[in-house]
Structure formats: structure tokens, C-alpha cells
């Protein structure tokens, strides 16, 4: 995919910034196919455990909330102004999964060494067949295009480590995870299995009431307690686990005495929750701070400027 084509796609996807929220961008099917094929090549060449450097901005679930994705970039800076890591769950539930994933893939192609996207549990055919992405592809294009996305998703990396100290993934830890080398060795392309290391990295959840490992109410993977986090960090000489996968009221939430943080970047999730969204900025000393997308006022009230930016959260030193 040549540079002028990528630039043109990005320009059209960003044109709607000043339009009413929800305005669709209908790229051609061949453009989307090219986005998938080109990004798939780049993703496959990069490791399954990305080794990244601060400063970087980290974002949690987006779930097709394209207007909020644009707002995140307005606050954090549009690439290449800042380096980004997204933790997965780009599609399903929201109304504009296609615009969301297309912009992220386009930025991946344009800035392959500055823009990074991990796999979430929704970047999996058996899940996004049910929760909205398949239907959106079928309605706006065709089923064949959905299958092309599946091939691309099967090549997404599953974890990242920032400056050898902050381990990032979509879901959480796994009882099978003994060395980080195991993550590097997960083969790609691959579907997400029902059990095992890859499944846990995308599906597991922390639970303050659990010691060790517990059952997960989702019916998939496990929950893990604060003791599990502490032991894991000590064993691997890490400072922090950064994950997404759960709606949290303030857009970010600490666990296990600030040894783990959950990030969620889709405010007013599904229009049903009153949650904020957050992005976490990691500076070059590994200090973490948060930029918050506040939930909009209840419908019917006009809120100046939509989701306003609350002050960055208290900085958390990491070294």
C-alpha cells in the first residue's frame, strides 16, 4: 500500500472530526482490504511480545466508539506527535467498528515503529461474529471483508513490555506464564483457543477477593488475586501490569497497591454506563499519569465541547 493511499485514507477518516458524531466514512472495499493485508505483513514481522520505549501513551478498550477515539487523539496528540499502544477490543458493541479499526490499521502502516496495537478478546472471529462487528461488515460491505479482518486479527501481537518494567496485555496473567519467552513463542497467525496462555492473556481478570487463582464469571479463563500480581512482578523484575478488558468508572483503576492498572478508553460505554475513559501517559522516567475523557451529561443536556478533559490524575512514579 503506497504512502499516498494511506495518507488519503487517514485524511478521509479524520475529516469527520468536525462533523456531527456518528457520521460514517465509507472507504472502498479494496482500500480496506489493502489496509488489512499491509498491516498484517507489518504485524507479522514485529514480535508477539513488543519491546517498547517510553514516553508512550497507552489506551484501553475502544469498542467501535469512533468519536471517542478521535477525542482521545485530540487530547493525547495525533500520531506521530505521540507514540501509542492500544490494548485491544477495537470492534463490537459500538456503532463504528469499521472506522475505528481502519484508522488504527492506517496509523500502524504509516508509523510502524511509533504506533502499536495489541489483540483483545474481541479481535477473534467467534466473539465478533456475535457482538456486532460481523453484522456491521455484512451491512456496510460483505462477509468476505469480515473474513479478511479475521486473517489480520489472527496476526496481532498479544503483549508489550515498556522499558523492561511495564507489562501490557488486554486481559491479564496466566497460571501457565512462567517466562516472558513463552509469549514470544506463541505462533501466529492463530485463532484464540478456549484455554491456555493466549486465552488467559486476553481474558483473565484481577479480583481483590481471590488468593492465587479463581474461577472467572465470564466462563472463560481465570481471576487472579493481588498476591499473584506481587509474586509475578517480583519474579520478572517488573514494576507494573497494565491491562484493559473491564469497564472502570474513572477510566482507570489501580489494583494490588498500584501494582496493576486497568485502563478503559470508551466513555459512556455502550450508552449504558456512566463511566469515564482514560489514556495513560508514561513519561521517560516511567512516571504514569492519566488523561480523562469525562462521560457526557445525560442525553438532552448540551455539554460544551462534548466529553471534556479532566485534569491528569496524580502521577505515579515507577522507578
From Swiss-Prot:
Its EC number is 3.1.3.16. The active site is at 122 (proton donor). Mn(2+) 1 binds at residues 61, 63, 89. SUPFAM superfamilies: Metallo-dependent phosphatases. GO terms for molecular function: metal ion binding; protein serine/threonine phosphatase activity. Keywords: Hydrolase, Manganese, Metal-binding, Protein phosphatase. Binds 2 manganese ions per subunit. Belongs to the PPP phosphatase family. PP-1 subfamily. PANTHER family: SERINE/THREONINE PROTEIN PHOSPHATASE, SERINE_THREONINE-PROTEIN PHOSPHATASE. This is Serine/threonine-protein phosphatase PP1 isozyme 1.
Amino acid at each position: 500500500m503506497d504512502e499516498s493511499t494511506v495518507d488519503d485514507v487517514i485524511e478521509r477518516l479524520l475529516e469527520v472530526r468536525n462533523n456531527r458524531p456518528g457520521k460514517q466514512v465509507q472507504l472502498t472495499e479494496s482500500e480496506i482490504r489493502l489496509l488489512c493485508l499491509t498491516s498484517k505483513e507489518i504485524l507479522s514481522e514485529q514480535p508477539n511480545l513488543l519491546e517498547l520505549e517510553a514516553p508512550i501513551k497507552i489506551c484501553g478498550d475502544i469498542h467501535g466508539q469512533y468519536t471517542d477515539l478521535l477525542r482521545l487523539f485530540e487530547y493525547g496528540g495525533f500520531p506521530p506527535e505521540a507514540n501509542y499502544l492500544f490494548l485491544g477490543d477495537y470492534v463490537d458493541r459500538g456503532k463504528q467498528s469499521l472506522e475505528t479499526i481502519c484508522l488504527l490499521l492506517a496509523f500502524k502502516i504509516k508509523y510502524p515503529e511509533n504506533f502499536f496495537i495489541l489483540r483483545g478478546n474481541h479481535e477473534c472471529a467467534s466473539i465478533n461474529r456475535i457482538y456486532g462487528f460481523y453484522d456491521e461488515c455484512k451491512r456496510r460491505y460483505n462477509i468476505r471483508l469480515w473474513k479478511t479482518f479475521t486473517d489480520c486479527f489472527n496476526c496481532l501481537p498479544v503483549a508489550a513490555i515498556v522499558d523492561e518494567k511495564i507489562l501490557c496485555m488486554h486481559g491479564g496473567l496466566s497460571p501457565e506464564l512462567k517466562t516472558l519467552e513463552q509469549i514470544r513463542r506463541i505462533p501466529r497467525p492463530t485463532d484464540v483457543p478456549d484455554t491456555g496462555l493466549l486465552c488467559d492473556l486476553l481474558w483473565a481478570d484481577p479480583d481483590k477477593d481471590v488468593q492465587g487463582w479463581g474461577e472467572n464469571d465470564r466462563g472463560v479463563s481465570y481471576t487472579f488475586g493481588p498476591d499473584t500480581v506481587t509474586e509475578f512482578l517480583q519474579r520478572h523484575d517488573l514494576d507494573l501490569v497494565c491491562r484493559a478488558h473491564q469497564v472502570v468508572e474513572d477510566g482507570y483503576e489501580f489494583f494490588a497497591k498500584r501494582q496493576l492498572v486497568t485502563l478503559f478508553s470508551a466513555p459512556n460505554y455502550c450508552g449504558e454506563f456512566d463511566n469515564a475513559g482514560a489514556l495513560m501517559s508514561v513519561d521517560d522516567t516511567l512516571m504514569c499519569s492519566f488523561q480523562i475523557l469525562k462521560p457526557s451529561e445525560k442525553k438532552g443536556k448540551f455539554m460544551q465541547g462534548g466529553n471534556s478533559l479532566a485534569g491528569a490524575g496524580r502521577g505515579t512514579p515507577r522507578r
